[in-house]
Structure formats: structure tokens, C-alpha cells
């Protein structure tokens, strides 16, 4: 089996790792960074992803951030020009980019992946994540919970039995999971969380504070200015990160707006104490899931051997202080909170490929599952924190005499009334023979696979007739839609490849024209007109093709000039005994070497 990569598809940043030997290793992106911003931008018909998309976000309104917050939302679409994209498609662009640079690193095709999700993601959100992987051309071997993945990274090669609490505060989601580790078994005992709480919310508090102060001082509301808001967002994120290391930071945004008297500048000093005051309720909001996870596991803080912090937002000092107080012990800092999830996903990939032995992962379903019964009551069949995969059946009956069909309304949640819980899907079991109310026996079976994806069936025990559905999530992508999106993604990949080849060709042509012109100028007195003419003619032909913007002609004339220049270099070498000619040879041949030489030339900083 080929390598199975592990992907942490994050709200703010994503990361990817692979098992090398027996150890997981982070794969760096083309910029050399170990995490990639989960940002997608559309500009001039081109799709930009990661660092480059984030850098131009201020000036480009068609930039999408934090799309993970909308995974599984049926009606959410991103409009770009006259086209609409689902959260799955935007996420697929990120996954496709990760897939590509992983393939470049490994030197082989990547088809299989383990993708992580917040432990508290519901079925719709999990299915949407799996669909995103499929659109990106990945066979998603497993969806695993982020805290579980970080526990895998922490617990690899550790033999002792431990109860571990994972506090996972990312860019947009929050989870707490309690696990039992021992003898290679990673068993999740409980999980709790909030899928709409994370580092973005901390950034927003700083932004709100800056907007209010600026309005009080200048009478201008920056929240109405899209470009100003993007600058504020970047500044708030930077200030938050700065305050993890220093007690005060200065925020400076010149020319943020304009008033009657001219340009307006934003200058502010934010102390860590003020930041803690602005965000204290957000930190406190994580206490309830913390307590509930312990309660559901049947444990107290005294039973916990280790506390692991996961997610970049756990670098916030107030968060670390709170967790230490609640847990009664110092959290473990042995693994990088930005990388642990991807590393754990890579380990699970190794388990799937057979490269890692003696590890068993026992995860749980985060929310209860059941159906709506008479009176709008939510009747649970599978309780939250049940180890998966699992299956559960229960017998129900009709609510009226001679009822010909039953509507199976599948739900997920913890509220007693169906209207307050999350609808996963509906289906109907028909052709029930006439019978008094309560006589027909309808067996409803819930089956949850290892990815947490739900299958539900209903069977009339009298006739043997059965109806079943795989919950495709309320985001509702059909196989046809996924195939169409896959095709779109592949076309974009082909377009990107063509665009890259075109840029490389133009760079090679520019370089070859420059070096050939220089060679002809430097050897003006050493060559006869008859020797120079083939090169001059080929050079003019290439310049014309470049001016006409004819790519086919440019390629043909580039090859012709390269050959003519090489012939000229040989003559120079013969005339001058080698040394001087060799210098002339280097230029024209440089243009014939493809992208590597050109890349090196273009990276030189003329100011250094």
C-alpha cells in the first residue's frame, strides 16, 4: 500500500504529516513552513491557496477564510463572481494543494489520507469533510477526532498506562477529550466541546476593542470598511500572538481611514492584562465542556495523569493558567500544539497501511443518535460517548390504526424534544399491511462506522420489507455533485499546471534573450559577421515570437536560438583555447537548462 498521509484540516491553519520509518514527520509546504493557512483566494481566474492567498487578503474581497466553521451547513455558499462554491469545494482546494506538495515531497502519487475533525463535529460535518477529501482526489481512509490524534502523537512508544485529558482549542473549534492509554490501546472515554469557539473569537475581541476606541476618538466606524477590517484582522491576530510572549504590544495601522482633516492613523497599546479582560468569558466558556468530559468519563481531575494542550490558541497564557488551575497540574508541553494532530493522523495512516503495529484506536460518537417518536419526542438509540464502530436496534410500532407507512426522522443531539436537535435525514418505510395501532413491529437499526458516519435502517418484522439510508448529511452532496466537483478540481489543477509551464517558458525566453544579447555584445570584436548572423537571426525570431505572445512559436524559436548559441560557443572556445570561450558558453546554455537555472537567477536580490 502507498503512503497514507495524515491531514489536520484546520479552521485557521492546516498541516500534513507522513510516517517515515517508525516516526511521523511534518511535510513542509512550498514556502518551507510547517503549517499552511486555510485560506483560498480567487484572482484573475486563478485560485490561490495558503500563504499567497493570506498575503493578498487585504486587497482581494474574493478571499475565503475559516470555511471550516461552515462545514455541514446545507444552505451555505460562497459567491465568487457568477459562481457559487460549497464549503466542501473550498476545503477541497486546500486539500488538493496539500496533496500536491505532499506528492512533490514524497516523489510519488498520494491517493490515501486520514483527515482529522473536531471531536464534537456532528454527522453532517464529518460527511462534509469526507466529501471534501473525495473532491480533492483523496481516498479518505479514516476520519478521526483531533484530540484522539494528538493523544496518538503523545502516546506513541510509551508503555505506561495513563489517563489523559486533551484540551484542544484551535482557530475555530474547541474540544475536550478524556482517553485511557495503555498497551497500545488508545480508548476515548468521553468527549465534549463547542464547534464555534476558537482563536478567531479572541481575534474578534481585539478587533471590537480597536473599532470602538477608534470610533470614540475619530467618529469613524471602521467596521463599515472591508479593507480596514482585513487590516484590523491581521493586526489583531498578530497582537494576540505577541501577547503570548510579551506583556504589552503596540498596534500601528497608518492611513486606516480618512476624515475631513485628512488621513487617519490607528495607534494603540494593548497589554496582556487588557487582552485577558476582553477575553475572560471565552476562556471561562471552555470550563463547562472540561467538566462535562470528566463527568461523562466517570472521573475527577485527580484521576488524570497527564493534560495535553492542543491547538495554537492554547499558547494564550490565560488559557494555560486556567487549564492548570482546573486540572491541578502543569499541562504537558512535549509536543507542538500546531503539529500534534497531523502527526497523530500520520500514525493512524501508518496503522492503516500496516507500517505501525500494536496500536488500537477506540473512538466515540460525540452526540446521541435516535429518532423522533410520537409527540415530537427524541428517542435515543445510541448514547453519546459510545465506542465506535457500533450498532443498536430497537422495536417501534405504528401510532394509528391501519397506518400504511412510517416516517423515520433521524436525529443527533442531547435535547429531549426532536425540534431542538439536529436533523440528519428522513426516510419512509411504506406498504405496512393494515393492522391496529401498536401491532406492527418496526425494527430501527443504527449503525455507526469507524469514521463516525451513520447508517440507519427500518424493517417491518411482519413482512420482512426493509428500507435503509446512509446519512449523507444535511449538506446533501450527491455522488453526481461530488463527481462534478472532482472534475472541476482536476480542471483547476490542469489549468495551474499549464499556467506554471507558461510562466517557466516566459522566464526561460527572457533569460535566453538576455544572455545571448550579452554574449553577442561581449564578443563583438572576436566573431565574423557570418558567425554572428545565425545567432542574430534566431534571436530576432525569438524576440518577435515573444512580442506576438505566441507560445508555440516561443518554444520553437527558443530551442532554435539555444542550438545556434551553443554552436557559437563552440566556435569561441576553439578560437580562444577554451578559457574565454567557456565564459561565453555559460550564458546561452543557461537558458537551455530549464526552470532550475532561471529560478536561481530570479531569486537574487539586487539590493544585497
Swiss-Prot record:
Give residue spans, biased composition: Gly residues: 587-597
Q: Which family does it belong to?
A: Belongs to the heat shock protein 70 family.
Q: Which InterPro entries match?
A: ATPase_NBD, Chaperone_DnaK, Heat_shock_70_CS, HSP70_C_sf, HSP70_peptide-bd_sf, Hsp_70_fam
- Mark the residues carrying the PTM Phosphothreonine: 173
Protein known as: Chaperone protein DnaK
| Highest taxon, organism lineage | Bacteria
Transmembrane region(s): none
Region feature (Disordered): 577-608
What is the organism of origin for this protein? Lactobacillus helveticus (strain DPC 4571)
* Compositionally skewed regions (Basic and acidic residues) per UniProt: 599-608
- What is a single molecular function from GO for this protein? unfolded protein binding
What's its job? Acts as a chaperone.
User: Where do Low complexity bias regions lie?
Assistant: 577-586
Q: What upregulates this protein?
A: By stress conditions e.g. heat shock.
